[in-house]
Curated annotation (Swiss-Prot):
Name of the protein in question: DNA-directed RNA polymerase subunit omega
Signal sequence, renumbered to the chain: none
Single GO BP term: DNA-templated transcription
Classification via InterPro entries: DNA-dir_RNA_pol_omega, Pol_omega/Rpo6/RPB6, RPB6/omega-like_sf
Record keywords, A-Z: DNA-directed RNA polymerase, Nucleotidyltransferase, Transcription, Transferase
Keyword Transcription: yes
Encoding gene, per UniProt annotation: rpoZ
Record keyword Secreted present: no
Family: Belongs to the RNA polymerase subunit omega family.
NCBIfam families: rpoZ
């Protein structure tokens, strides 16, 4: 466990995605879905959509698929 004031930490979140850019896009899109009324998968004290989205990513409820051909 680290002493980060932010929970979950960026280090933990980056284990779930390819890079910081992907994390920003994924969390923003998920937050938008929550704003639009999507079901949430975690129980957190905050009612802020972005906080909920980040916690969902950290707990593995939200994934993404890289559609770019390499």
């Amino acid at each position: 466990m680290n002493n980060s004031m932010i929970n979950p930490s960026i280090v933990d979140l980056l284990k779930r995605v390819e890079d910081r850019y992907s994390l920003v896009i994924l969390s923003a899109k998920r937050a938008r879905q929550i704003i639009d009324g999507a079901e949430t998968f975690v129980d957190v004290e905050s009612n802020k959509p972005l906080t909920i989205a980040i916690n969902e990513i950290d707990e593995g409820f939200v994934n993404y698929k890289d559609t770019e051909e390499k």
